[in-house]
Amino acid sequence: MEAIKMQLPCNFLPQEDGRCGWYEMLPEPPVATPLRGEVKADWVVLGAGFAGLAAARRLGELQPEKKIALIDARRVGFGAAGRNSGFMIDLPHDLSSHSYTGAQDSDLRQIRLNRGAIDYMRDIVKRYAIECDWQERGKFHGAVEPHGIRALEAFAKGLSQLGEPYEELDAHAMKRITGTDFYRAGLHAPGAVQVQPAALVRGLGATLPSNVTLYEDSPVRNIIIGNPHTLVTDLGHLQAPKIVLANNAYAAQFSQLGLKGRILPMYTYGSLTRPLTASEQQTLGGEESWGLLPADPMGSTVRRLANGRICIRNSFTYNPNVRASAQQLKLVLAAHQRSFNKRFPMLPKVAMEYTWGGALCVSRNGGAPFGEINPGVFSAVCQNGLGLTRGTISGKLIAEYALGIKSDLLDYALLQPKPTANPPEPLLSIGVRSTLAWKEWQAGIEL
């Protein structure tokens, strides 16, 4: 069946969205190679985040004689893939759930997929000696008030039912680890990996197979679906008979492919403090480096880094134009400083040095449009808030799916439900924003 010719205008492209500390701490990258002139390839992958990098790498590995083009509007590591909190999470992590877990069969499949992603990434990081502060130290969950403690108990119960190991922690143990007496209860799960996300993404981009060409700073203005498909940029055209969509939240604008109205572009936000002085680190105490997720999914993620900085991540907004406004960033900075001050009152002079927003993509039912959605058009978008793991495994598996390579993990990916339809506007915006406000209010001091 031949692809029906259609045009997909790309009206929403990655913006500045604040100053991302993860990216700003890296050295200057080598000069970018933008797309120029008329270029032809066997495959084109749109978006150089975790899904796109994994898809391009796997296509290059499996078809070394083919020409693979990977294209991104910005520098690798600048976009959403370099703007998260740096957790590769192995366990269920349903942001719409009260306690992250859901139906047991689905959770078990997701664990297999997440660990498949971690295994694949670990091999790449070791093989190419990618410097990204890779730490296999698991993750903590922390709770403050009764609502959060109940969520933590529900998470622990879910892990027990799944046969997953964990350690429950009391307030004294949490203070010994974090240096603060803010948390009343906690839990440690050993399987997660913590990384410097922008460093990891940049390292992945620098170690692609030789038959993969990376085009950066090349915003795609229009996509012509046909035979072949054509991507139009400011400086050229890129043609290929097959395309992998790995642009996550930015794919929500593609109504003709059935994605608009089913996946939602959301934003969450992070801040990094200045480095703590030696005196401040001594005052804080606790372990030198740790990472903590909130018991309530709407609460604050906190990481203490070995370089002396502390990362705060909280606040969700619905941004259908896939950009964060200056006003949103101003409000978020104030919210992050409040969250920091609540947790670390012994550090009254520590301020945020960087604050940024990052796009993520979710669906109402946690589903993803994984597979071939139009002849020669393959989708690896909508990671539902788990970009590092789901993005990585979605990208790897979509390449294998496109080439007819079967596996248990691919079967699990294909069992994911497709995204359900969203209500029409303005009901959608009203509903999403009121739900976010209600859930943040419920999170209370956990935020």
Language-model regions: role of each:
Residues 1-43, 61-62, 66-67:
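Extreme N-terminal leader/targeting segments of oxidoreductases
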Residues 60-83:
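Glycine-rich FAD pyrophosphate-binding loop
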Residues 150, 157-160, 182-241:
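Helical element adjacent to the flavin cofactor pocket in flavoenzyme catalytic cores
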Residues 362, 374, 401-435:
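Active-site-proximal substrate-binding core of FAD-dependent oxidoreductases
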